[in-house]
Amino acid sequence: MIKAVVFDAYGTLFDVQSVADATERAYPGRGEYITQVWRQKQLEYSWLRALMGRYADFWGVTREALAYTLGTLGLEPDESFLADMAQAYNRLTPYPDAAQCLAELAPLKRAILSNGAPDMLQALVANAGLTDSFDAVISVDAKRVFKPHPDSYALVEEVLGVTPAEVLFVSSNGFDVGGAKNFGFSVARVARLSQEALARELVSGTIAPLTMFKALRMREETYAEAPDFVVPALGDLPRLVRGMAGAHLAPAV
């Protein structure tokens, strides 16, 4: 029986694309490009550091990825800009259905497991007004690895006192879905973009940076096991969990 629902943060509960407003203000006309390449390199650097055994916390990785991205445009980040970007990342917009989804999942244990550094995650959750929605906000920093390393998912067992069979893991990121399934969790993928919608964007002509991001990050990975469930939005998750757990969840508002 499911006793805990554990969420990825970036891209699942919080929209990483919302940082584009800040990058566009800083570099008009180049904000979308910066946002997409930055996120891509952020993920790549976390995986490369994990493979090389050279851990740095997620804000360090994020700064490295931003420096790379600006370098492709011949730009150098200054400390003022980096401070602004840190604030932007700590104030990412939660998806519109996130708060309601979390409320409806009570009294099951609700947690975040994220690559984010502890201070980043605490600020992110607090700024969104969601602190009371979680029993735990778990950072991989405690293990000095990044998802999808198995040690990162083991933190859920240690912190929440549950077995993999008692966890439903929720993510919109293909690499995270694969990692969580590999660890032994039941997994629900939030599929906000249908294959049909993506195909229409890809054949429409010029591929915008955001469309490329969708192609790279918003599909299931072919190398990994498929998720147990697919939901189009977080608002559909409580109904799924009720069916799985027979749980007495908070009523929909």
Swiss-Prot record:
Its EC number is 3.8.1.2. It catalyses: an (S)-2-haloacid + H2O = a (2R)-2-hydroxycarboxylate + a halide anion + H(+); (S)-2-chloropropanoate + H2O = (R)-lactate + chloride + H(+). The record marks 12, 147, 153 as: Important for catalytic activity. The keyword Hydrolase applies. Keywords: Hydrolase. The active site is at residue 8. It is an enzyme of class 3 (hydrolase). Residues 171-176 are annotated as: Important for catalytic activity. An (S)-2-haloacid binds at residues 9-10, 39, 114-115. The keyword Calcium does not apply. (S)-2-haloacid dehalogenases may be used for the biodegradation of halogenated substances and their derivatives which are widely used as pesticides, herbicides and other industrial products. Optimum pH is 9.5. GO terms for molecular function: (S)-2-haloacid dehalogenase activity. SUPFAM superfamilies: HAD-like. NCBIfam families: HAD-SF-IA-v2 (TIGR01493), HAD-SF-IA-v3 (TIGR01509), HAD_type_II (TIGR01428). Catalyzes the hydrolytic dehalogenation of small (S)-2-haloalkanoic acids to yield the corresponding (R)-2-hydroxyalkanoic acids. Active with 2-halogenated carboxylic acids and converts only the S-isomer (or L-isomer) of 2-chloropropionic acid with inversion of configuration to produce R-lactate (or D-isomer). Homodimer. Belongs to the HAD-like hydrolase superfamily. S-2-haloalkanoic acid dehalogenase family. PANTHER family: HALOACID DEHALOGENASE, TYPE II (AFU_ORTHOLOGUE AFUA_2G07750)-RELATED, HYDROLASE, HALOACID DELAHOGENASE-RELATED. This is (S)-2-haloacid dehalogenase. It comes from Xanthobacter autotrophicus. The gene is dhlB.
